[in-house]
């Protein structure tokens, strides 16, 4: 058996998320079907392990999975073979032969997400699957002040949707930035941390655009840490604007080498 690490991108519009679900089209089920077809339907079937889930409508620029294949195929041939059978809304970027101890989920040391928010006065139907929409004027300086409050190790209880399966709401955000993409008239948020929980990025962005528009105090993030109340964060911005940008593994980022502690998963 050879273990392969696969980096892929996908348009999440027509997927019911990453994780396999009965009678629904998901990234995991689509990739699993193709991998097993390449291996001539082995018994037991090949199982795909992802770095984590993405929700329905969320996109990935570089999701990572691993699987064990019953015979050796050169990595680039594996990439070409997968791409020849995958649908048009998925593409394998890279395949690597890895040690049998590598695990796409448990070896993660950090993840980077991007959120794109269209700032047009009117909702653009051509962007509806790829951005959120915020028509109100924003003060980027206020957003950047609030972003600084999100960086560090904190209890993000107020920023996590109900249903999150985690032992604790404490996580560390290493970097949080926002800039305006002038060409596309979009706010672009980026977050890099050792782990993110259910809807966390989408809820944080909802708070940030409200701060930028002046409907929340600039340092309201600090108050939300204290109250630990999801309802007070209010808004969850649409899934369409969220992109999994990069998955880091131990050794890839010497500045932040430590994966999420077991007790925080």
From Swiss-Prot:
What GO molecular functions are on record for this protein?
RNA binding; tRNA pseudouridine(38-40) synthase activity
First-tier enzyme category under EC: isomerase
Question: Which Gene3D superfamilies did the record assign?
Answer: Pseudouridine synthase I, catalytic domain, C-terminal subdomain, Pseudouridine synthase I, catalytic domain, N-terminal subdomain
- What are the entry keywords? Isomerase, tRNA processing
- The positions annotated for binding substrate are 113
From the record, give the transmembrane residue ranges.
Answer: none
Q: Is-annotated flag, keyword Nucleotide-binding? A: no
Active site residues per record: 55 (nucleophile)
UniProt KW tRNA processing keyword: yes
Question: Which InterPro entries would you find in this protein's record?
Answer: PsdUridine_synth_cat_dom_sf, PsdUridine_synth_TruA, PsdUridine_synth_TruA_a/b_dom, PsdUridine_synth_TruA_C, TruA/RsuA/RluB/E/F_N
Question: Which reaction does this chain catalyze?
Answer: uridine(38/39/40) in tRNA = pseudouridine(38/39/40) in tRNA
Q: What is its EC number?
A: 5.4.99.12
User: Coiled coil located at which positions?
Assistant: none
Gene Ontology biological-process entries: tRNA pseudouridine synthesis
Q: According to the lineage, what is the superkingdom?
A: Bacteria
Give the function comment from the record.
Formation of pseudouridine at positions 38, 39 and 40 in the anticodon stem and loop of transfer RNAs.
- Family, per entry: Belongs to the tRNA pseudouridine synthase TruA family.
Summary of subunit composition and partner proteins: Homodimer.
Designated name of the protein: tRNA pseudouridine synthase A
The source organism is Levilactobacillus brevis (strain ATCC 367 / BCRC 12310 / CIP 105137 / JCM 1170 / LMG 11437 / NCIMB 947 / NCTC 947) (Lactobacillus brevis)
What lineage is this protein's organism placed in? Bacteria, Bacillati, Bacillota, Bacilli, Lactobacillales
């Amino acid at each position: 058996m050879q273990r392969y690490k696969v980096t892929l991108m996908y348009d999440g519009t027509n997927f019911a998320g990453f994780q396999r679900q009965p009678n629904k089209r998901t990234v995991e089920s689509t990739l699993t079907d193709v991998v097993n077809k390449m291996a001539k339907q082995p018994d037991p079937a090949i199982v795909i392990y992802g770095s984590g889930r993405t929700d329905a409508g969320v996109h990935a620029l570089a999701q990572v999975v691993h699987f064990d294949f019953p015979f050796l195929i050169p990595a680039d041939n594996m990439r070409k073979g997968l791409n020849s059978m995958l649908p048009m809304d998925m593409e394998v970027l890279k395949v690597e032969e890895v040690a049998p101890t590598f695990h796409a989920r448990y070896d993660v040391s950090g993840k980077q997400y991007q959120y794109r928010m269209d700032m047009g006065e009117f909702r653009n139907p051509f962007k509806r699957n790829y951005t959120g929409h915020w028509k109100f004027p924003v003060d980027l300086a206020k957003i950047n002040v609030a972003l600084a409050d999100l960086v560090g190790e904190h209890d993000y209880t107020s920023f996590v949707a109900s249903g999150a399966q985690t032992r604790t709401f404490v996580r560390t955000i290493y970097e949080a930035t926002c800039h305006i993409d002038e060409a596309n008239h979009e706010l672009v948020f980026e977050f890099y941390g050792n782990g993110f929980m259910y809807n966390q990025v989408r809820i944080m962005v909802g708070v940030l655009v409200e701060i930028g528009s002046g409907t929340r105090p600039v340092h309201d993030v600090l108050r939300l840490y204290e109250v630990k109340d999801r309802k007070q964060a209010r808004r969850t911005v649409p899934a369409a604007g969220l992109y999994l940008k990069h998955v880091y593994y131990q050794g890839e980022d010497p500045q932040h080498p430590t994966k999420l502690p077991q007790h925080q998963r």
